[in-house]
């Protein structure tokens, strides 16, 4: 079974309400389904690391990719609930960030759960009841401190969340990313990009991270 892939993001694909990426690893192209939210954050022709859940059927196999091991494991917990298949699991993770989903399940927030495509009241109730105890293992998925906490308002990148998600998909951890954004905001690479310049922030962070690892 495939559990992890690292390769080059060749292209994104969409089939109906499903979206994903063609990931080239050692000369082989893998079609991996992602949440739409994750797919929109990918940069063309970039290196990409994904934690994989593989579903094997008689007519073939399907790969589902996630930017972190915790999110992949949360997906596996979701689809272990009766009536929640892989598409519903992806819909939940598209609608809610992992820490928001954990909070909704542990708090029995049925209205929030029902906002995900394909999740009705009965399924939401089943999620809240069946996962009340096991979801506690994901308590570490609490909202992280802001990447820009403590920065002057004119330095705060409005594109910070998108930059963070892209860097995580490239294999950087959250601590490295926070350090990079703070360093760029403090002028480590000259005048910081404007708050809405996602490409500028991403480019500056990648350059800073590359220098730090050299």
Curated annotation (Swiss-Prot):
GO CC term, one of those recorded: Holliday junction helicase complex
Annotated spans, Flexible linker: 147-157
Alphabetized UniProt keyword annotations: Cytoplasm, DNA damage, DNA recombination, DNA repair, DNA-binding
Primary localization: cytoplasm
Region (Domain III): 157-214
A GO term for molecular function: four-way junction DNA binding
Cytoplasm among keywords: yes
GO annotation terms (biological process): DNA recombination; DNA repair
Superkingdom in the source lineage: Bacteria
Region feature Domain II, mapped onto this chain: 68-146
Annotated localization: Cytoplasm
Region of interest called Domain I, as start-end residue ranges on this chain: 1-67
Function: The RuvA-RuvB-RuvC complex processes Holliday junction (HJ) DNA during genetic recombination and DNA repair, while the RuvA-RuvB complex plays an important role in the rescue of blocked DNA replication forks via replication fork reversal (RFR). RuvA specifically binds to HJ cruciform DNA, conferring on it an open structure. The RuvB hexamer acts as an ATP-dependent pump, pulling dsDNA into and through the RuvAB complex. HJ branch migration allows RuvC to scan DNA until it finds its consensus sequence, where it cleaves and resolves the cruciform DNA.
Subunit structure and binding partners: Homotetramer. Forms an RuvA(8)-RuvB(12)-Holliday junction (HJ) complex. HJ DNA is sandwiched between 2 RuvA tetramers; dsDNA enters through RuvA and exits via RuvB. An RuvB hexamer assembles on each DNA strand where it exits the tetramer. Each RuvB hexamer is contacted by two RuvA subunits (via domain III) on 2 adjacent RuvB subunits; this complex drives branch migration. In the full resolvosome a probable DNA-RuvA(4)-RuvB(12)-RuvC(2) complex forms which resolves the HJ.
UniProt record similarity statement: Belongs to the RuvA family.
Domain notes: Has three domains with a flexible linker between the domains II and III and assumes an 'L' shape. Domain III is highly mobile and contacts RuvB.
Name recorded for this polypeptide: Holliday junction branch migration complex subunit RuvA
